[in-house]
Every structure is written in structure tokens, then in C-alpha cells.
């Protein structure tokens, strides 16, 4: 799941996962 989230763009992940962009950015950065 982590790899799939990293591959998807932050904006798309927000809509799919429903998590705020800030949290998504932190995940991608890490």
C-alpha cells in the first residue's frame, strides 16, 4: 500500500484516501 500511495500524486491520494494534503506530503517526504 505504501508504494501505491507514493506512486499516486498527493492530490489524487487526498481524494482517494481522504487524508489532508499535509499528512500526504509528510508520508511522501518520508
From Swiss-Prot:
Reaction(s) this enzyme catalyzes, per UniProt: a ubiquinone + NADH + 5 H(+)(in) = a ubiquinol + NAD(+) + 4 H(+)(out)
Domain of life: Eukaryota
This protein's record includes keyword Heme: no
GO cellular component: mitochondrial inner membrane
Keyword Cell membrane tagged: no
EC number: 7.1.1.2
Topology of this chain in the membrane: Peripheral membrane protein
Localization per record: Mitochondrion inner membrane
Keywords annotated in UniProt: Membrane, Mitochondrion, Mitochondrion inner membrane, NAD, Oxidoreductase, Translocase, Ubiquinone
GO molecular function, one term: NADH dehydrogenase (ubiquinone) activity
Assembly description: Complex I is composed of about 45 different subunits.
Function: Transfer of electrons from NADH to the respiratory chain. The immediate electron acceptor for the enzyme is believed to be ubiquinone.
Name of the molecule in the record: NADH-ubiquinone oxidoreductase 18 kDa subunit
